[in-house]
Each structure stands twice: as structure tokens, then as C-alpha cells.
A protein has these predicted regions:
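Conserved catalytic-loop aspartate of Hanks-type protein kinases
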Residues: 192
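ATP-binding glycine-rich phosphate-binding loop
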Residues: 2-37
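Conserved small/polar residues in nucleotide/adenosyl-binding loops
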Residues: 252-253
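Conserved activation segment of eukaryotic-like protein kinases, specifically the C-terminal portion
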Residues: 167-181
């Protein structure tokens, strides 16, 4: 259910936040601007109440704290109420923009130095995450906010982070999954690294490493075709031994 302006949401640590306004929504939930003891924060509120395993893992992540300052990490967990729950995190500063804006050329980096800095920041963030014993599991182009002037990066949507070897239950996007995960495998830090290479390729080339002539010729990208093009029959667009999926102007992001 949608929350109302002025509504109070109780936290497991005590106290409550007050809803100010909606900031945005997606497939999993709604993000609200909230007031926490006079400080502005963001609340992610789930459209569907998660199961106990997910909720307890989220609670543990709040206790453990963020692997680094690059993560917009869950800071507080709400009680289960009004048919669902959510968590509190820091707000994204206004000078940071979604990665998709860079892919669509709505935003551009101020310099190559800034672009390289963004790549290094993303790699460092996930290195720290893995050092803490976590796997991200749902790495995609919607997980990053970037400052185009400096290349500084903030990593969001960290509620799906799980201990290495465990599965969050959140299905990622096939375009960013390792082929074995598309086929039904369990995500881990190694599949995270595959997804990371896809992100870096897209950052530098503004195109997907598996999207060339084959995907352009696809009449409709159904789930079965996704499993084929990103899983069982994935072909790198610059594969030296297979030119069947070379870059196509229509396939550029």
C-alpha cells in the first residue's frame, strides 16, 4: 500500500520517521522522503512484504554497517506495519545522477579522468563488499549514482546484499547476469564480478557486450530469448573466433 504524507512509520530501534513526499517508485517498492528527528532521509517501502529470511538479513546488514562510504546502505529497519516494511538510508545528493543517464547521453562526464574515476570507484566498492563476505546478486545499471564532474559513485539498492553463498530471492536482470545465473545458478562474488565487467564495458563503450547483430534480429526479447542470448548461446560482440554477433548500430544503448 502507498503511504500518506504525514504518516508515521515506526523503526525497530525505537522512534519513528514521518513521510514528507514520494521520491520515486519501481518494481519492488516506493522511495519516500522522510523526516528522522529533524534530518531528511530516504525510506524504501516494499510493495510486497518480504519473507522472514529477507527481513532478518536486512536487519543484520543494518547492524553490520556499510562496507564503505560508497554504499547508500540500510541504516534503520522499520517494523512490519501497514502490510509491509522498509528501511532508511541516506538521500542521494542532487549532483549525482543515475548511470542510465550516462548510457543515454543525457549526462556526460566532464573528462576522461572523471570516467576512469567512476570505474575505479565502482570496482573498489565491490572489492570492499566482497571483503566483508557479501555478494550483491542483482548488479545492474540501476545500482549507481555518479557525479559527472568528479566521477564519484554512490551504490544503491543494497537490500539484496547477502552473505556469500546465500540467495536473496530477488531475480536480477538477465542482461547483467553471468550465463550460469541466467541458467538458474546461485549468485556469488564471482557472478558479481561478471556483472561488474558488463557494467564497465557499458561505461566505456555505451553498448552491451552481448548485444549485436543477433539481438537486433530478435523480433521480440522474450524470456526464452533472454536465456539464449545472455545464457546458453551468449556471444561476445568482439569474439575473435565468432563474428555472428558483431556490433550493430541499432544495438547501441
Amino acid at each position: 500500500m502507498d503511504l500518506k504524507v504525514g504518516q508515521k512509520i515506526n523503526l525497530t530501534s525505537g522512534g519513528a520517521v514521518t513521510i514528507i513526499k514520494e521520491l520515486g517508485r519501481g518494481g519492488q517498492g516506493i522511495v519516500y522522503l522522510v523526516d528522522l528527528n529533524g534530518e531528511k532521509k530516504a525510506l524504501k517501502w516494499y510493495l510486497k512484504s518480504p519473507d522472514d529470511k529477507f527481513y532478518k538479513n536486512l536487519q543484520q546488514n543494518v547492524i553490520n554497517g556499510a562496507p564503505s562510504e560508497a554504499f547508500l546502505w540500510p541504516e534503520y529497519l522499520t517494523e512490519r506495519q501497514f502490510g509491509s516494511c522498509g528501511y532508511i538510508m541516506k538521500l542521494r545528493p542532487t549532483n549525482y545522477f543515475e548511470f542510465s543517464n550516462f548510457l543515454l547521453a543525457k549526462k556526460t562526464f566532464a573528462s576522461y579522468t572523471a570516467m576512469l574515476a567512476a570505474a575505479m570507484k565502482i570496482c573498489n566498492g565491490f572489492m570492499m563488499l566482497h571483503r566483508f563476505g557479501y555478494s550483491y546478486q542483482d548488479l545492474n545499471d540501476g545500482n549507481f549514482f555518479i557525479d559527472p564532474k568528479t566521477g564519484d559513485v554512490l551504490i544503491c539498492d543494497n537490500d539484496n546484499v547477502m552473505p556469500q553463498g546465500e540467495k536473496s530471492g530477488i531475480m536480477g536482470k538477465a542482461r547483467y547476469m553471468a550465463p550460469e545465473i541466467v541458467a538458474g545458478g546461485v549468485p556469488d562474488k564471482y557472478s558479481d564480478r561478471f556483472s561488474l565487467t558488463v557494467i564497465l564495458f557499458m561505461l566505456f563503450y555505451a553498448n552491451h557486450p552481448f548485444e549485436g547483430a543477433k539481438t537486433v534480429a530478435c523480433p521480440c526479447m522474450t524470456e526464452s530469448f533472454e536465456k539464449k542470448f545472455y545464457g546458453s548461446e551468449a556471444v561476445f560482440i568482439y569474439d575473435t573466433g565468432d563474428n555472428s554477433n558483431r556490433p550493430d548500430r541499432k544495438s547501441v544503448v
